[in-house]
Structures are given as C-alpha cells and as structure tokens.
C-alpha cells in the first residue's frame, strides 16, 4: 500500500530516517554513506532510500521546501509507514550576533509565522520542541567533535524572502539563533503522531551580516552535520 506522495511498500522504511530538504542531497547521502542501498520512492521527484550504516537499517528522504510540502511527507511517513525517529539535516540563516557561519545549531524548539499549528491546535499556540533523548544524543555526540555548535531555538518561516527584515532584530532579542522553514512542522507532526524528532541546522548564511558560505564550504560543513546525524541514529533504540 502506498500513499498519494510515497510509492513505497509498507516495510520499505527503517524506524529512523534522515531528512534533508533536497531530494538530490538525500540521494548523495544514501550513495555516499549507506550500504546495500535501495531507492524506495520517487513520486514527484522526491527521492527516498533505505540502506545500512554500520549494520543498522536507516532511511533517508527529501522533504522539499517549506512547511506545507514537508508536512505531507512527515505525516505519511509517521502514520502509514510507522517511521518513529526523524532527524532533519538542513541549513539555516543566522540572525544572532553570537552565531557564526559554519556553526551547527541543534534546535530545541521552533517558533513560526505559519498558520498550520493554529489549524492543528484549535487556534492556540503550540510549543513545538525536539525529543529530549534525541536532543541529548546530538549534544553528547557533538561534544566529541571539533564542530562549533549551539543549542537553542530557531524560527520556521513561510517566507524565504521576507519584506520585513526588521523582524529579525526582534527574533534575536528573544534568543532565536537561526531562521529556516521546516523544523516547526516536523516537531509539531512528531508530537501529534507520538514520534521522535530532532533537527540539525548548519549556518550557511548570516542574514544580518550578509555573509555566505561558498559552494565548497557548504558541501564540507553539510557532510560534518551528516556524520553527526548518522552517529546519533546508531545510538537510538530499535523498535
């Protein structure tokens, strides 16, 4: 049985999945890091794969850009395919002066300007947060590396190009470390469906300072984040 957006058999996915936004990055991760890889879905070009990492079955799949797109895949993976552990691996833009290019943010929670949670949570504000055990594993793993990391809140925006950039100053005052587009949707879907989720975001741009990583720098830093995510996946309990 498949879903409208995933054409995979029910047993196609592992209990733990890594999810970048870009389906081609999912393909790169699968082909670079996993063994015995099988492509399990390709509807609308949103590629998904399952393979093995150091003997553990792990899946990787893209989720697209923005909360509406990502929420479709989160929901179908959680409800139909019974995936339990979600690790988002993505990029973000920094807005806080203490956050630098190449920093890795472990997202405790995610504020948002999206109305999706107002619909989901009966017009109330839902505090979308990571699973504590997964968050702890991320921090413990990062402590063994040379990666400069921060743990705190991010902001999930429906707009990539905002017309009101002065809002970034307000977000920084509240301690928001970075801006991206999907973490709030992931944490909310995980809470709704009793799943576990954590998000890792590499700082590839500094919105306030107008600094950006080069293409080569992005590739290197994202690979470091992927290694962390895979190490965390190995430490999670199996179903």
From Swiss-Prot:
CDD domains: PNP_EcPNPI-like. Its EC number is 2.4.2.1. InterPro entries: DeoD-type, Nucleoside_phosphorylase_CS, Nucleoside_phosphorylase_d, Nucleoside_phosphorylase_sf. PROSITE patterns: PNP_UDP_1. The active site is at 205 (proton donor). GO terms for biological process: purine nucleoside catabolic process. One of its GO terms (cellular component) is cytosol. It holds the Pfam family PNP_UDP_1. The keyword tRNA-binding does not apply. GO terms for molecular function: purine-nucleoside phosphorylase activity. The record marks 218 as: Important for catalytic activity. Phosphate binds at residues 21, 25, 44, 88-91. Catalyzes the reversible phosphorolytic breakdown of the N-glycosidic bond in the beta-(deoxy)ribonucleoside molecules, with the formation of the corresponding free purine bases and pentose-1-phosphate. Homohexamer; trimer of homodimers. Belongs to the PNP/UDP phosphorylase family. This is Purine nucleoside phosphorylase DeoD-type.
């Amino acid at each position: 049985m498949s879903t409208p957006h995933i054409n995979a058999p029910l047993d196609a996915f592992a209990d733990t999945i890594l999810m970048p936004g870009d389906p081609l990055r999912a393909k790169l991760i699968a082909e670079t890091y996993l063994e015995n890889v099988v492509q399990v879905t390709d509807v609308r070009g949103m590629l998904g794969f399952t393979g093995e990492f150091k003997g553990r079955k792990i899946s990787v799949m893209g989720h697209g850009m923005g909360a509406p797109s990502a929420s479709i895949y989160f929901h179908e993976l959680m409800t139909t395919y019974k995936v339990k552990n979600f690790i988002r691996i993505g990029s973000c833009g920094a807005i806080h002066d203490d956050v630098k290019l190449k920093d890795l943010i472990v997202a405790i929670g995610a504020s948002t300007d999206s109305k999706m949670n107002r619909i989901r949570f009966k017009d109330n504000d839902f505090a979308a947060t990571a699973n504590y055990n997964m968050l702890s594993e991320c921090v413990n793993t990062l402590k063994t590396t040379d990666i400069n990391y921060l743990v705190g809140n991010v902001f999930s925006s429906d707009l990539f190009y905002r017309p009101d950039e002065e809002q970034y100053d307000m977000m920084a005052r509240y301690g928001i470390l970075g801006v991206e587009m999907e973490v709030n949707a992931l944490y909310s879907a995980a809470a709704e469906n009793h799943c576990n989720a954590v998000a890792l975001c590499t700082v590839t741009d500094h919105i306030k300072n107008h600094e950006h990583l080069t293409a080569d720098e992005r590739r290197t830093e994202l690979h470091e984040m992927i290694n962390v995510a895979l190490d965390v996946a190995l430490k999670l309990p199996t179903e």
